[in-house]
Amino acid sequence: KVYGRCELAAAMKRLGLDNYRGYSLGNWVCAAKFESNFNTHATNRNTDGSTDYGILQINSRWWCNDGRTPGSRNLCNIPCSALLSSDITASVNCAKKIVSDGNGMNAWVAWRNRCKGTDVHAWIRGCRL
């Protein structure tokens, strides 16, 4: 599923991401835009053999199990396929674990490069939330 900007913002808010660990909703919407272009089915293979999955491009080396990543830790205790669902609950729950891990949203390269230090409120402007 490809989410609309405000549709995604509303879903993320409902699932408790607004100001989770101090990151406003705009940060999460911005991250999703530049990680997956709001597409829940996005997958990208990394040079180390791991794969990033879903709307927030969660990595199989650490966070989920895809059965093909050597030494996978599966810290979110989920199959990576769960991160490709049109229902973003699994992605959000795992993202909460990731952002609590010490590096905050710096764990997402696209957030660090495209969202950090910008006017992220623009990503939810005009949305009925």
Curated annotation (Swiss-Prot):
Any single GO CC term annotated in Swiss-Prot or TrEMBL for this entry: extracellular region
Pfam family, one: Lys
Transmembrane spans: none
GO terms, molecular function: lysozyme activity
Entry's localization field: Secreted
Complexes and interactors: Monomer.
Other comment: Lysozyme C is capable of both hydrolysis and transglycosylation; it also shows a slight esterase activity. It acts rapidly on both peptide-substituted and unsubstituted peptidoglycan, and slowly on chitin oligosaccharides.
Similarity section: Belongs to the glycosyl hydrolase 22 family.
Protein name: Lysozyme C
Species in which this protein is naturally found: Lophophorus impejanus (Himalayan monal pheasant)
